Amino acid sequence: MTGSTVSRQENSPKRPNDSNGEFKRLLVPETSQPEEDELHESPPENQILNVEEDRDKTYDSVPPFSWAKLWKFTGPGFLMSIAFLDPGNIEGDLQAGAVAGYSLLWLLLWATLMGLLMQLLSARIGVATGRHLAEICRSEYPSWARILLWFMAEVALIGADIQEVIGSAIALQILTRGFLPIWVGVIITSFDCFLISYLEKCGMRKLEGLFAVLIATMALSFAWMFNETKPSVEELFIGIIIPKLGSKTIREAVGVVGCVITPHNVFLHSALVQSRKTDPKEINRVQEALNYYTIESSAALFVSFMINLFVTAVFAKGFYGTKQADSIGLVNAGYYLQEKYGGGVFPILYIWGIGLLAAGQSSTITGTYAGQFIMEGFLDLQMEQWLSAFITRSFAIVPTMFVAIMFNTSEGSLDVLNEWLNILQSMQIPFAVIPLLTMVSNEHIMGVFKIGPSLEKLAWTVAVFVMMINGYLLLDFFMAEVEGFLVGFLVFGGVVGYISFIIYLVSYRSSQSSSWSSLEMSERVVSTET
């Protein structure tokens, strides 16, 4: 250890060796310090996994890597990865393959890496503070901004949920050979809110086990389709390695990038990581947890990338350059596959339906889970989990039922609806990403785990790029859809308010003095300096 480091450590105030409650008070703005009993409640014990086998040991550096411990940390990243595999993403994949062939696979890879960066920052804020993003927003922003952020998050979640529930309903319709109409599928799917409540009571590992089965089902289904259709491996690798973007594929490219950041997923991941018991007072333990979550999340998104690649390649092989390419969508994709590749021992239509059902069910359950954290975090509501799940589910099921009944027989109408829902979710991205980057780069919130200048610049660059891509999509959509002076005037007024709120969020900084400032230097010593 260098002499200057020792000097800083000796002259700096010692980190408080106090109770967990007092430590949490350091993380809350001084002007809004809650009483001990008002601090957020920890999850029930059966939802927290103890990962510290050697909790009695004291480490001067990050504990050594352990495969057994990595296994214990495995779970939250795979739940997070579901948002990269929802029916909206699957539809984006199939349309990208049908319209652009293999040429956008490089963009799919880089978009997944950008999404990984944002999710790692979400995990970082959850582990380092012991609170999830919605809770931190509640304590940091003024009431009006907090309520508006909650509303935006709920709107994005409802939009995503409608897509996911309809995706599951379409899958059920396929698997029952049209016997179940879409609206009946919506009713069946709505009961998963009670399933998640039951699995939560059984333990976090049971819930994670369900998602492991659903992800494996998707992987096997779409891998089987990939093997059955035999896409060109050479063209596939060229598409991954060589960037190529034609004027006719810009819309599909925007769709690929726009799907990588799902607003509710940013809030969800910061809460999921708290299912592993990590003491925020132990700097080395926190760093250890972040290391394991980085490995686990990277592995999870590698799996999601491969599943998305399988779907894109299957439709690139079957429909690129055909007359069906411009009309293919989630509703008719299975029938196009059946017409193209026939039946066989395992008809491809049903394999597609099974994969789509797994995608829809897994994403609706994670959406319900995210809704609980968003509502309880922003509004500080304490209620039974089943009731919270039911309320959250109702926000989405009621409009979804209306949509399913209205558009049950019209494939074209469902495609138009899906386009509107993509626009709705794209509009909400800034209201998840900007608070995340603001908080994770704030020393008052993060202490020694505040991200450095280089990572902060990279994160903001990625965020601005994704928001610009979605801004292009919004502009293109509204220019095509908005007609008339009155409608145009109302849209203009909405855009002004929308941009004003974004500017407020970007320029916002906590006015509270840092509770960590006097402690940072003493904690900046890590194992590499010894």
From Swiss-Prot:
<feature type="transmembrane region" description="Helical">
    <location>
        <begin position="147"/>
        <end position="167"/>
    </location>
</feature>
<keyword id="KW-1133">Transmembrane helix</keyword>
<feature type="transmembrane region" description="Helical">
    <location>
        <begin position="429"/>
        <end position="449"/>
    </location>
</feature>
<dbReference type="InterPro" id="IPR001046">
    <property type="entry name" value="NRAMP_fam"/>
</dbReference>
<keyword id="KW-0406">Ion transport</keyword>
<comment type="similarity">
    <text>Belongs to the NRAMP (TC 2.A.55) family.</text>
</comment>
<dbReference type="GO" id="GO:0046873">
    <property type="term" value="F:metal ion transmembrane transporter activity"/>
</dbReference>
<keyword id="KW-0408">Iron</keyword>
<protein>
    <recommendedName>
        <fullName>Metal transporter Nramp5</fullName>
    </recommendedName>
</protein>
<feature type="transmembrane region" description="Helical">
    <location>
        <begin position="253"/>
        <end position="273"/>
    </location>
</feature>
<feature type="compositionally biased region" description="Polar residues">
    <location>
        <begin position="1"/>
        <end position="10"/>
    </location>
</feature>
<dbReference type="GO" id="GO:0016020">
    <property type="term" value="C:membrane"/>
</dbReference>
<feature type="transmembrane region" description="Helical">
    <location>
        <begin position="387"/>
        <end position="407"/>
    </location>
</feature>
<feature type="transmembrane region" description="Helical">
    <location>
        <begin position="299"/>
        <end position="319"/>
    </location>
</feature>
<feature type="transmembrane region" description="Helical">
    <location>
        <begin position="179"/>
        <end position="199"/>
    </location>
</feature>
<dbReference type="Pfam" id="PF01566">
    <property type="entry name" value="Nramp"/>
</dbReference>
<comment type="function">
    <text>Seems to be involved in iron uptake.</text>
</comment>
<keyword id="KW-0410">Iron transport</keyword>
<keyword id="KW-0472">Membrane</keyword>
<feature type="transmembrane region" description="Helical">
    <location>
        <begin position="65"/>
        <end position="85"/>
    </location>
</feature>
<feature type="transmembrane region" description="Helical">
    <location>
        <begin position="485"/>
        <end position="505"/>
    </location>
</feature>
<feature type="transmembrane region" description="Helical">
    <location>
        <begin position="458"/>
        <end position="478"/>
    </location>
</feature>
<feature type="transmembrane region" description="Helical">
    <location>
        <begin position="207"/>
        <end position="227"/>
    </location>
</feature>
<feature type="transmembrane region" description="Helical">
    <location>
        <begin position="98"/>
        <end position="118"/>
    </location>
</feature>
<dbReference type="GO" id="GO:0006826">
    <property type="term" value="P:iron ion transport"/>
</dbReference>
<feature type="region of interest" description="Disordered">
    <location>
        <begin position="1"/>
        <end position="53"/>
    </location>
</feature>
<feature type="transmembrane region" description="Helical">
    <location>
        <begin position="341"/>
        <end position="361"/>
    </location>
</feature>
<keyword id="KW-0813">Transport</keyword>
<feature type="compositionally biased region" description="Basic and acidic residues">
    <location>
        <begin position="11"/>
        <end position="27"/>
    </location>
</feature>
<keyword id="KW-0812">Transmembrane</keyword>
